[in-house]
């Protein structure tokens, strides 16, 4: 079957079929191999891409910029301090301006409704670099990383996301696993599980793909036999430190420790994290948390000994952001 993803948005993966997602993963693999072999061909020469960042980023910005440069495209980085977006100009008007100058627009920010509005009015492909609800480029990188680190067929790979499951990573891992027919498990305190509406939508996708979905607060049920353990930060950096106490108390049993990794019963289990991770007290935030909560001096959502172990494939994930983002741009713009 021939695929035509030309001029397609990437907003959440909700509207991408299983075969379209697999096509992007295959293209990511091919582009990665070409880069490693020195045989990459530039297919985006003459293309201009706007990168709108209302939230700061290291991996997403670098991945988009390097992917674009590798393919011969040019990018313009737009941050909140250097634009009129939201201050003197609406996103609707911004979309109609940038759509006349650029071949595509990336957006990283807050509400999903904003990137949807951008896509509605820009007239060019729009790529979601992260919103509060979804993180689709991260999911493509995550699945590529799991494929590379597991000999099983995709449909037999099992993974758990453990921690605060109401965020964009928890939502998106549930979604892509359901789309691709995987064994996906979401584990969190009951108050921090995904919204019922999202779970119901993903169960419908799972019925079509053959995916197995588990959403639970029971750790042993969730981690048993999994190939990969995912987590993410427990709190957003915009939240005051004083408000972390209740969240930390709730999530402490869900911290990824060597003991939790052993509870999987899989000696080959791998650890995954979208990064940045608070795995020690060397960062400013990590130090502040450790001073207030000494039990977290060795890491918040994951401990230092897990993060620095051979089980950690988070840096492969980070690299794969670039290869998968490149695939999204090539599929849409080449």
Swiss-Prot record:
Location within or outside the cell: Cytoplasm
Gene Ontology process terms (BP): arginine biosynthetic process via ornithine; citrulline biosynthetic process; L-arginine biosynthetic process
Chain residues that bind L-ornithine: 168, 232, 236-237
Pathways involved: Amino-acid biosynthesis; L-arginine biosynthesis; L-arginine from L-ornithine and carbamoyl phosphate: step 1/3
GO cellular component entries: cytoplasm
Biological role: Reversibly catalyzes the transfer of the carbamoyl group from carbamoyl phosphate (CP) to the N(epsilon) atom of ornithine (ORN) to produce L-citrulline.
Protein name listed in UniProt: Ornithine carbamoyltransferase
Native organism: Actinobacillus pleuropneumoniae serotype 5b (strain L20)
């Amino acid at each position: 079957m021939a695929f035509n993803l030309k001029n397609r948005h990437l907003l959440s993966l909700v509207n991408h079929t299983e075969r379209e997602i697999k096509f992007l993963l295959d293209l990511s693999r091919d582009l990665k191999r070409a880069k490693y072999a020195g045989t990459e061909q530039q297919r985006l020469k003459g293309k201009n891409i706007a990168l709108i960042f209302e939230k700061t980023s290291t991996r997403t910005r670098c991945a988009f910029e390097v992917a674009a440069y590798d393919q011969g495209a040019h990018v313009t980085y737009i941050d909140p301090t250097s634009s009129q977006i939201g201050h003197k100009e609406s996103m609707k008007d911004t979309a109609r301006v940038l759509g006349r100058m650029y071949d595509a627009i990336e957006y990283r920010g807050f509400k999903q409704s904003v990137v949807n509005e951008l896509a509605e009015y820009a007239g060019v492909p729009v790529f979601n670099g992260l919103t509060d609800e979804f993180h689709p480029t991260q999911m493509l990188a995550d699945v590529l990383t799991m494929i590379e680190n597991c000999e099983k067929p995709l449909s037999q790979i099992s993974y758990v996301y453990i921690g605060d499951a109401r965020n964009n990573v928890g939502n998106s891992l549930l979604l892509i696993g359901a789309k691709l027919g995987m064994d996906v498990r979401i584990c969190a305190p009951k108050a921090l599980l995904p919204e019922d509406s999202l779970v119901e939508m993903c169960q419908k996708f799972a019925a079509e793909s053959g995916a197995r979905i588990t959403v639970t607060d029971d750790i042993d049920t969730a981690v048993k036999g999994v190939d990969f353990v995912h987590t993410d930060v427990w709190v957003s950096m915009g939240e005051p430190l004083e408000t972390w106490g209740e969240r930390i108390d709730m999530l402490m049993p869900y911290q990824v420790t060597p003991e939790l990794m052993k509870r999987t019963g899989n000696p080959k289990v791998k650890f995954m994290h979208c990064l940045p991770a608070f795995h020690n007290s060397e960062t400013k935030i990590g130090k502040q948390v450790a001073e207030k909560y000494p039990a977290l001096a060795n890491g918040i959502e994951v401990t230092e000994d897990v993060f620095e172990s051979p089980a950690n494939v988070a840096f492969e994930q980070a690299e794969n952001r670039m290869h998968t983002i490149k695939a999204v741009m090539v599929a849409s713009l080449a």
